[in-house]
């Protein structure tokens, strides 16, 4: 029944009960305090009135006594200074009496009777005060007879009667206020006892309600929290009622179900992470092996590229040297072509000279022939002359012989010249062919020079390209080494992550679920081997 009432409503009702009791107690206390305060004010005012009136009465008596002494001394004819001093004291006493009586008049009055008595007292006081002032005037005027004849005692007795009557009224007021205070005190005792009894009943009821509705359910909730803190999620949480504690049980039940789902999800996630980490470790192992093979291949490639670079550089140097030799050969061939041209020109000149010599030889041959004819004619004429012409015949014979020999020599010279001309022509043709060949050689050498220059340029470009390839291979080698380092770091991270996953699995392993068969995993050997291999 009580667990269907909301705790806030119960606390509100309890608070309302305490407030009602407090209001009742406060109201009654206020009434009692107000009555006590009223009685206390009455007693205080009465005391103030009595004190002020008493002091005023005492001051008037002092003034009367002082004036009597002054009158006695004036009658004894003492120095006037002493009399004046006593009259000054009397005046001071009258001023004090006025001050005290004004305080008496300023106090409030409780009722009409008290006010009437106060008015009568004021009249008698003023009469007595006026009489005392007349005595002072009589003494100042040295009218001792009038001083002695004034009926001051009657006036004083009247004021004394009013004074005593007012004191009796003040005493009656004080006694009445005290009796009222005693009666209020008795009622207060009964009220306090009733309030304490009611408070005790309400307190015991509140304690029973708190124990039933709060303490016991909170102890049950604490037990559930302790079991959850120890990792036991298998204990069922039952919900009763519809108050805040029941809502707390429902929230705790939802929290338990949520924790069960979370722990299950974390366990599944830890297992999935471990499986993924094992696959990552195997992949890292394969990647590390391939990276090492790639690094070795890149090192071999780098060495081959270095050798190829040296070979290409050497080829480039040889090509430059061959190009230089080709340029030298081209220059030499050009010079040979120029010399061949000069030889052709010279051979042409020799051929022309040989032809001229042949013409001269023909002339000599003609002259020899004519000389022979002339020698024949001379021989004929010598024969005709007989003995006289014998010497001339001998001379003619010698001339003929010389002409024959000259003709024969001219023929031989002509044959030689013809042969020489023929050979010169053949040599000229050969020289011309040689010049053409030399020009072909010059063109070929020039082409070879150009080709060798292109080869040298291509070799330089190949050398630069190979250097760039070598740099690229070196960079690839560095990148491969960095990749290998990253593989090591990845393996280390995977191992650390697996350890964290195992730690997480160990952390959630403390939770016990219904139908629980979860076993915390251990570090996989693959990750350990991969980490050890990569670290090594």
Swiss-Prot record:
UniProt membrane topology term: Multi-pass membrane protein
Alphabetized SUPFAM superfamilies for the sequence: Aspartate receptor, ligand-binding domain, Methyl-accepting chemotaxis protein (MCP) signaling domain
Region listing for The 3 Arg may form a positively charged pocket, which binds the alpha-carboxyl group of the attractant AA, in residue ranges: 64-73
Glutamate methyl ester (Glu), modified sites: 300, 489, 498
Protein name: Methyl-accepting chemotaxis aspartate transducer
GO-annotated cellular components: plasma membrane
Positions of modified residues (Glutamate methyl ester (Gln)): 293, 307
UniProt domain Methyl-accepting transducer: residue ranges: 269-498
Cell membrane recorded as keyword: yes
Residue ranges occupied by any HAMP domain in the UniProt entry: 212-264
CDD domains: HAMP, MCP_signal, Tar_Tsr_sensor
Classification via Gene3D superfamilies: Aspartate receptor, ligand-binding domain, Methyl-accepting chemotaxis protein
PANTHER family cross-referenced by the UniProt entry: METHYL-ACCEPTING CHEMOTAXIS PROTEIN I-RELATED, PROTEIN ICFG
Keywords associated with the record: Cell inner membrane, Cell membrane, Chemotaxis, Membrane, Methylation, Transducer, Transmembrane, Transmembrane helix
Record localization: Cell inner membrane
Lineage: Bacteria, Pseudomonadati, Pseudomonadota, Gammaproteobacteria, Enterobacterales
Stretches that traverse the bilayer: 11-31, 189-209
Domain of life: Bacteria
GO molecular function: transmembrane signaling receptor activity
């Amino acid at each position: 029944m009580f667990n269907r009432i909301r705790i806030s409503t119960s606390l509100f009702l309890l608070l309302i009960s305490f407030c009602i009791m407090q209001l009742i107690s406060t109201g009654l206390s206020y009434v009692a305090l107000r009555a006590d305060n009223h009685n206390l004010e009455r007693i205080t005012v009465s005391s103030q009135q009595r004190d002020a009136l008493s002091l005023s009465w005492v001051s008037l008596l002092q003034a009367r006594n002082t004036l009597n002494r002054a009158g006695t001394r004036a009658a004894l004819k003492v120095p006037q200074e002493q009399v004046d001093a006593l009259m000054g004291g009397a005046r001071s006493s009258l001023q004090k009496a006025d001050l005290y009586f004004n305080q008496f008049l300023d106090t409030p009055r409780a009722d009409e009777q008290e006010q009437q008595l106060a008015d009568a007292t004021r009249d008698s006081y003023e009469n007595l005060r006026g009489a005392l002032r007349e005595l002072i005037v009589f003494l100042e005027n040295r009218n001792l007879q009038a001083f002695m004849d004034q009926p001051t005692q009657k006036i004083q007795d009247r004021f004394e009667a009013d004074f005593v009557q007012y004191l009796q009224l003040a005493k009656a007021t004080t006694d009445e206020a005290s009796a009222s205070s005693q009666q209020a005190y008795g009622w207060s005792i009964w009220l306090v006892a009733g309030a304490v009894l009611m408070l005790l009943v309400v307190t015991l009821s509140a304690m029973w309600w708190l124990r039933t509705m709060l303490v016991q359910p909170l102890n049950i909730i604490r037990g559930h929290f302790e079991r959850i803190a120890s990792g036991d999620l298998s204990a069922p949480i039952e919900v009763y009622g519809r108050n805040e504690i029941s809502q707390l049980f429902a929230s705790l039940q939802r929290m338990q179900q949520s924790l069960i789902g979370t722990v299950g999800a974390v366990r599944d996630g830890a297992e999935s992470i471990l499986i993924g980490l094992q696959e990552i470790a195997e992949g890292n192992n394969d990647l590390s092996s391939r990276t090492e093979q790639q690094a070795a291949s890149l090192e071999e490639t780098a060495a081959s590229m270095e050798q190829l670079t040296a070979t290409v550089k050497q080829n480039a140097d040889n090509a430059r040297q061959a190009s230089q030799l080709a340029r030298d050969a081209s220059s030499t061939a050009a010079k040979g072509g120029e010399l061949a041209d000069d030889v052709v020109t010279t051979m042409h000149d020799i051929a022309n000279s040989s032809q001229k010599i042949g013409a001269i030889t023909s002339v000599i041959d003609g002259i020899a022939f004519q000389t022979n004819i002339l020698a024949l004619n001379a021989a004929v004429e010598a024969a005709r002359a007989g003995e006289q012409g014998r010497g001339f015949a001998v001379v003619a014979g010698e001339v003929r012989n010389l002409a024959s020999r000259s003709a024969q020599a001219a023929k031989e010279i002509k044959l030689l010249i013809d042969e020489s001309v023929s050979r010169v022509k053949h040599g000229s043709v050969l020289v011309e062919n040689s010049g053409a060949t030399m020009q072909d050689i010059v063109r070929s050498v020039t082409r070879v020079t150009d080709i060798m220059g292109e080869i040298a340029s291509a070799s330089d470009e190949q050398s630069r390209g190979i250097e760039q390839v070598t740099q690229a291979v070196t960079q690839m080698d560095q990148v491969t080494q960095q990749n290998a380092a990253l593989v090591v770091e990845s393996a280390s991270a995977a191992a650390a992550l697996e350890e964290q996953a195992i730690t997480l699995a160990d952390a959630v392993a403390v939770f016990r679920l219904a139908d629980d068969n979860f076993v915390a995993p251990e570090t996989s050997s693959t990750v350990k081997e991969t980490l050890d291999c990569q670290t090594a």
